[in-house]
Amino acid sequence: MNLEFKRKLPTPQTVKDMYPVTEELARQKLENDRQIKAVITGEDQRLMLLIGPCSADREDAVLEYAARLRTLQERVKDTILIVPRIYSNKPRTTGDGYKGMLHQPDPNGQPDMLKGLIAIRKMHMKVLEQTGFSSADELLYPENYYYLSDILSYAAIGARSVEDQQHRLIASGLDVPVGMKNPTSGDLSVMMNSILAAQHPHTFLFSQWEVHSKGNPLAHAILRGSVNKYGRSLPNYHYEDLSQLYELYAKSALANPAVIIDTNHSNSGKRWEQQARIAKEVLHSTRHNGDIGRMVKGLMIESYLLDGCQKPDGGVYGLSITDPCIGWEKTEQLVLELAELRG
């Protein structure tokens, strides 16, 4: 067997007991949950922005970024609901490269999953303590969600995981919104089937238990573009793409038809500077068609303190070490413009 069992890690409950959430923070998290759920169900008409760095590489820069988001949130609170995107694990196309703070709490150090679990919990907790935001993170490893389940308000399932049965089943047992990205192939039926699976109850094996999920009516779509057989990026944020998704929802029996548009990845062709243009085009589509306007609940934007990216050992504070992001000045300008368009 080509597998070495290095050490047994503490259970999610043990880590939660080591780093507990106070009653005040628990109440704040529940209020954040309520607002985010209200956007997904349509009770709250604000536009949700899932916004933050491609990967949360260092706690200090993430905390500064989140603090700036809090100040910005107060300026746009009537039309925009901000949810920090704080991704602590990073899927890799080939399996190589920096895999996120969970794997490497020090980007230049060796993998250490125990230190990583503690580091990501402490980081998410500090964001909640210092800014009042409970964050979004990617559900890359389904079993790891429960280390953070009391401090996250949104989970995303990525393009490479959306066909996986365990991801779908775990999503059906979460009590927060879960966004299902379309697969890299662009096949929307795969995404819609994932949403259907997540919205239904299931009995399955998890962490040495037979468990039963109740179904998650807040599971919804994320459009992130696709890649064709020649490796070319194909966007799916245009008006006709949104119309097609609306028709798929209309033919389904899914609860809470909703979509978040990812403005980067294959939608931008990895041209990160195009995110502002894409975001504004999506909002124009929502204004021209009421059905699309009701379906589009928000945008996912990759943003950090500085424009662009660097290698993992670059050492520049607030500059992404994975995919390039728009910097703070562009971020602030974009959010204010979106608030004006939304108003």
Name every feature range the model reports, one short phrase each.
Residues 1-41:
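N- or domain-start disorder-to-order transition segments that initiate the globular core
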Residues 7, 66, 79-244, 265-281, ...:
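Active-site-facing alpha/beta catalytic cores
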Residues 37-45, 251-256:
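Glycine-rich phosphate/diphosphate-binding loops that line cofactor/substrate pockets in enzymes
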Residues 48-61, 323:
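Conserved phosphate/anionic-ligand binding catalytic regions in large, soluble enzymes, centered on
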Residues 52, 261, 327:
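Conserved, mostly hydrophobic/aromatic
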Residues 245-250:
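Redox- and metal-dependent alpha/beta enzyme cores, enriched for Fe-S-associated oxidoreductases
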Residues 304-342:
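Internal helix-turn-beta structural module
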